[in-house]
Amino acid sequence: MTQPRHFIDLWKLDGATLRLLLDDAHARKAARKGWPQGKVDADAPAKDRVLSMIFQKNSTRTRFSFDAAMRQLGGSAIISTASDMQLGRGETIEDTAKVLSRMVDAVMIRANSHADVERFAQVSTVPIINGLTDKSHPCQIMADILTIEEHRGPIAGKTIAWVGDGNNVCSSFIHAAPLLGFELKIACPAVYHADLHDLARAEGLQGKVSMTTDPKAAVSGADVVVADTWVSMGDTDHDERLAALEPYQVDDRLMDLAAGNGVFLHCLPAHRGEEVTDAVLDGPRSLVWDEAENRIHAQKSVLAWCFGAIG
């Protein structure tokens, strides 16, 4: 039996596959220029396919973008929360995965625990897609890189500065850096540092990834500056986080240290006045609205790949 193509972590794929997905996303987006959102792509790679979406966390961009993506690929999506399902009453992940494998063509999970997604994938006979976990957010990084390339050309050779909490999104940037050939400079307080195992893996792949506690050093000369919320869903140390991360706010003075055509990204939702100022988020260097839209286009290519329509 052919093993399903799971999309769980970028480091489990190779650079050629990520490049294929990005090129496909660029082409699909360009081909749709001026189309209504509900019009199906010419090749309809998800025709007659059904995607199950399971949410253990609240979602705006992931929920709407995956639903729109499936519609544009010619398929459909079923949306549920864990509390809607028997998962919320004690049915095991393994039993749930076996049942859904008989009813849908792929499962996207936005989970509290990365281990839950891995357990789904171990027994599922259909592709499992990581829509966000506590450990990584690969779909977001594909959208981010798509956005960077739209505005600044190929990602290879670029320098990205991550400023703030070394969280799950930061981890996926670390995973991508050695595979796509960009430099990643991380600035974070020591108490909220990036995952050391991820850093070691990137180093083993000769990735140009570094970490500092100095945001100015990380941002200096960078092509792209990326921030994220300092307090994620489920975090209980709100006050401690704000105190530790206050020096890492991205404002115009920090952005002025970036390259002359440096741009700003944020996966949203943003806590305005905390990790980023209004002036940066709404300013001419911000690409966050294109970035949000590009979740659709990047995920369409992920889905097409999972279904075997490309690659």
UniProtKB/Swiss-Prot annotation:
Classification via Gene3D superfamilies: Aspartate/ornithine carbamoyltransferase (3.40.50.1370)
Coiled-coil region(s): none
Listed GO MF terms: amino acid binding; ornithine carbamoyltransferase activity
Residue positions binding carbamoyl phosphate: 59-62, 86, 110, 137-140, 267-268, 295
Record key words, sorted: Amino-acid biosynthesis, Arginine biosynthesis, Cytoplasm, Transferase
Top EC class of this enzyme: transferase
Localization in the cell: Cytoplasm
UniProt catalytic activity: carbamoyl phosphate + L-ornithine = L-citrulline + phosphate + H(+)
GO biological process: one example: L-arginine biosynthetic process
EC numbers: 2.1.3.3
Amino-acid biosynthesis keyword on record: yes
Record has NAD as a keyword: no
GO cellular component: cytoplasm
Alphabetized PROSITE patterns for the sequence: CARBAMOYLTRANSFERASE
Family of the protein in this entry: Belongs to the aspartate/ornithine carbamoyltransferase superfamily. OTCase family.
HAMAP family attached to this UniProt entry: OTCase (MF_01109)
Role description: Reversibly catalyzes the transfer of the carbamoyl group from carbamoyl phosphate (CP) to the N(epsilon) atom of ornithine (ORN) to produce L-citrulline.
Protein name, as recorded: Ornithine carbamoyltransferase
